[in-house]
Amino acid sequence: MEDSPLPDLRDIELKLGRKVPESLARSLRGEELAPREGAADPSGVGGSCSSSSSCSSFAPSVSSSSSSSPASGSPRRSHPSALERLETKLHILRQEMVNLRATDVRLMRQLLLINESIESIKWMIEEKATITSRGSSLSGSLCSLLESQSTSLRGSYNSLHDGSDGLDGISVGSYLDTLADDVPGHQTPSDLDQFSDSSIIEDSQALHKHPKLDSEYYCFG
């Protein structure tokens, strides 16, 4: 029996949209596959196919496995790109944090300067208030002293010239004499008058006694 002619695979390729693998074509030709080629075959089909229908049943599995291989490689490529984007975002965030820290440091320095200026102004205001209070207290004490002196002088002057302060009918001289009586060893004008009268009497008596002595002396002589 003669071998059947090789079937036309173009119709199958047009229907599948893919080229028939070489291993399948060899099996259709009736050639024996080597052990290495059978092991390397992704379809895992060994031996020869007797008809085109049996070979066509394995074609979709081969095409599906070949079509799934590019899709499995796409996540591997997208994974590094996602890592790169994440690293880029982290770098940007770190740079922004550094900028924010520098801005925070500048703001803190400005706040410290403002606080120091406020404290200095407050100290100056307090010092000025204390100086003003001291000056006002000194001026008030001086004014009170002057007023007290003026009132005391006026009161003493008025008491001397006023007769309604308990000295009715008594002169100032007699009042001073009464005050001098209270002082021990102090001679009043009345004492001086008595002293002058007694001295005059004693002098007159002495004058009257001396002529008598002289006359008696001359008599005995």
Curated annotation (Swiss-Prot):
Segments for region (Disordered): 24-81
A Pfam family annotated for this UniProt entry: LURAP
Protein name according to UniProt: Leucine rich adaptor protein 1-like
Origin species: Mus musculus
Residue numbers bearing the N-acetylmethionine modification: 1
InterPro entries: LURA1/LRA25, LURAP1
Gene Ontology BP terms: positive regulation of canonical NF-kappaB signal transduction
Chain's gene name: Lurap1l
Keywords: Acetylation
Low complexity bias (residue ranges): 48-75
Biased composition (Basic and acidic residues): 28-39
Superkingdom in the source lineage: Eukaryota
PANTHER family: LEUCINE RICH ADAPTOR PROTEIN 1-LIKE
